[in-house]
């Protein structure tokens, strides 16, 4: 066997032949110096090495394994280049996304054909929801009968509900729902009427002062009093009143004395609302 520069093949052959070398000889072969390699003398087993032969073999095998691993393992640059590119990752993700899309298409096909049991159970639920959301249109005859029953009793009973269901050809649920909505509407109308009445001046204190006439306003008594019985009262559709009506908040002694005989129709009860067109009323808004 010819001596040649250090290589992995030579080390593998030497390890198979169970050659024993010292640390200095291994360093010389690793450096690749041919002059040093020519002066190497292999120790014989007869003379006996100073160190056990097993240690040399383990060290030699360890060096051979490291060299082989370095040659087999690619460099760091090659590892970076070997990593998948972003485009390859995108294609793999798209391939994974194709599978759920196919499953969705098969599910839609099953829904159309109605092969699965779950779809069969889901269809009646959707139909019930659509039927519940649909608004019932009542005919004028039905509304008239419902309004008549509502005027008699705002809270319908079971017997009346069954009667209306037979007469109007409606379900009891529809009649019950109509009465609930009608009660809410009645409640809103009542509240709105109270608010309008309050701000229209029916409940606002209103007093007039005949001693301080305004320009263009004829002086008339603002206090509701009854004329003496000696004066003739005009013909009225209602009977004569026998009591004296006094505005609230005023004591009878606090009413100023006025010559009622100078006013025409002084025997009539003059209400503040009768003079509404002649004077600008106070409006809170």
Swiss-Prot record:
Widely expressed in the embryo prior to gastrulation. Becomes restricted to the ventral marginal zone by mid/late gastrulation. Ventral localization persists during gastrulation and neurulation in the ventral region of the closed blastopore and in the proctodeum during tail bud stages. GO terms for cellular component: nucleus. One of its GO terms (biological process) is BMP signaling pathway. CDD domains: homeodomain (cd00086). The keyword DNA-binding applies. Keywords: Developmental protein, DNA-binding, Homeobox, Nucleus, Transcription, Transcription regulation. Residues 69-80 have a biased composition (Basic and acidic residues). GO terms for molecular function: DNA-binding transcription factor activity, RNA polymerase II-specific; RNA polymerase II cis-regulatory region sequence-specific DNA binding. Its main location: nucleus. It is found in: Nucleus. It comes from the Eukaryota. Residues 131-190 bind DNA. The keyword Nucleotide-binding does not apply. Pfam families: Homeodomain. Residues 30-54, 69-88 are annotated as: Disordered. Transcriptional repressor. Acts in a ventral signaling pathway downstream of bmp4 to antagonize the Spemann organizer and ventrally pattern the embryonic mesoderm. Represses transcription of the dorsal genes gsc and otx2. PANTHER family: HOMEO BOX HB9 LIKE A-RELATED, HOMEOBOX DOMAIN-CONTAINING PROTEIN. This is Homeobox protein vex1. It comes from Xenopus laevis.
């Amino acid at each position: 066997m010819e001596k040649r520069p250090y290589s992995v093949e030579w080390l593998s052959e030497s390890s198979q032949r169970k050659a024993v070398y010292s640390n200095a000889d291994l360093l010389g072969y690793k450096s690749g110096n041919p002059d040093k390699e020519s002066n190497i003398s292999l120790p014989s087993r007869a003379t006996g090495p100073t160190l056990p032969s097993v240690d040399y073999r383990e060290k030699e095998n360890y060096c051979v394994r490291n060299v082989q691993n370095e040659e087999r393992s690619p460099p760091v640059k090659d590892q970076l280049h070997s990593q998948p590119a972003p485009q390859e990752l995108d294609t793999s993700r798209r391939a994974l996304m194709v599978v759920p899309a196919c499953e969705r298409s098969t599910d839609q096909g099953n829904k159309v054909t109605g092969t699965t049991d779950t779809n069969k159970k889901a269809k009646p639920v959707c139909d019930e929801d659509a039927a519940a959301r649909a608004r019932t249109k009542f005919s004028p005859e039905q509304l008239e009968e419902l309004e008549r029953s509502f005027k008699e009793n705002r809270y319908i009973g079971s017997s009346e509900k069954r009667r209306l269901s037979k007469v109007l050809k409606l379900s009891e649920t529809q009649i019950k729902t109509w009465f609930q909505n009608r009660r809410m509407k009645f409640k809103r109308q009542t509240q709105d009427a109270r608010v309008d009445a309050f701000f229209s001046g029916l409940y606002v204190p209103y007093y007039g002062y005949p001693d301080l006439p305004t320009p263009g306003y004829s002086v008339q008594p603002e206090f509701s009093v009854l004329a003496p019985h000696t004066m003739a009262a005009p013909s009225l559709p209602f009977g004569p009143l026998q009591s004296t009506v006094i505005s609230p908040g005023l004591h009878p002694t606090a009413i100023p004395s006025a010559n009622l005989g100078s006013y025409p129709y002084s025997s009539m009860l003059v209400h503040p609302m009768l003079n509404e067109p002649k004077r600008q009323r106070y409006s809170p808004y």
